[in-house]
A protein has these predicted regions:
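N-terminal auxiliary segments of SAM/dcSAM-dependent transferases
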Residues: 2-77
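SAM-dependent Rossmann-like transferase core, predominantly class I methyltransferases
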Residues: 62-129
């Protein structure tokens, strides 16, 4: 007998519940939504627009286990966004931080029209380079 599929809402709720011990409820729900959208191969707005649609994401259970063990979402997904671009990340590669994105935006604004010489030390994911 085939196993019934979950709705997007139920999948997000179940994953968020597993993460609530590690994160506050709002953060747990945000992580759950991002993971569900990623593994369903849809955008976050698409996930939210039709929460009663069935979700076909067999990898989500394994992702849930990794997330519940405290592994960062970016490592579980294998990617992280920086300045609207996706960069591959895995254990051993630093995850691009929002603060670094803000710093890079500040430098770009301040140095516009000039030819600065910059040095990126400890590159990590290479998103600044």
């Amino acid at each position: 007998m085939p196993v019934p599929m979950l709705t997007r809402r139920k999948a997000v709720g179940m994953l968020a519940e597993r993460l609530t011990g590690l994160y506050d409820p709002c953060e747990a729900r945000s992580i759950a939504r991002q993971a569900a959208a990623f593994y369903a191969g849809i955008t976050l707005p698409a996930l939210l627009a039709d929460p009663e649609a069935e979700i076909d994401a067999p990898e989500l259970e394994q992702a849930a286990e990794r997330l519940a063990a405290g592994e960062p979402l970016q490592y579980v997904l294998g990617e992280s966004e920086f300045f609207g671009r996706r960069f591959a990340v895995r254990k051993g590669v630093l995850i691009p931080r929002p603060e670094t994105e803000e710093l890079a935006a500040l430098v770009v604004r301040r140095e516009r029209g000039r030819a600065p010489r910059l040095l990126d030390i400890g590159t990590g994911s290479g998103c600044l380079a």
